[in-house]
Regions:
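Short intrinsically disordered terminal tails
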Residues: 1-2, 73-75
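Acidic, low-complexity, intrinsically disordered interaction modules
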Residues: 12-74
C-alpha cells in the first residue's frame, strides 16, 4: 500500500462496530472501497464510500475489539 502524503488526516471520532455516524449516516451500513492508500498521520487504510451519489473519503482502523477510530481529510 502506498502512503498518501498530499492530505492531512484529522481525528474525527471513534465508536463501536456498527454504531458510528459519519457524513450523517451509519457508516457501517455502506460498502467501503479500499483505496490501497494509507493515511500518514494515523497509519490507517483509506476508504471511499458513496452516500446519496456523493463520494466521501475516510481512514479507519479497529483499535480494540469492535472499536473503530475514524479520521477525515482536513479541509
Amino acid at each position: 500500500m502506498k502512503v498518501l502524503k498530499d492530505k492531512i488526516w484529522q481525528y474525527e471520532k471513534h465508536g463501536i462496530d456498527g454504531e458510528v455516524e459519519l457524513f450523517g449516516v451509519n457508516i457501517f451500513d455502506y460498502k467501503w472501497e479500499d483505496t490501497k492508500e494509507i493515511a500518514k498521520e494515523c497509519d490507517f487504510p483509506i476508504y471511499k464510500v458513496v452516500i446519496d451519489g456523493k463520494e466521501h473519503e475516510f481512514a479507519t482502523g479497529e483499535v480494540s475489539n469492535n472499536v473503530w477510530c475514524f479520521y477525515l481529510p482536513k479541509e
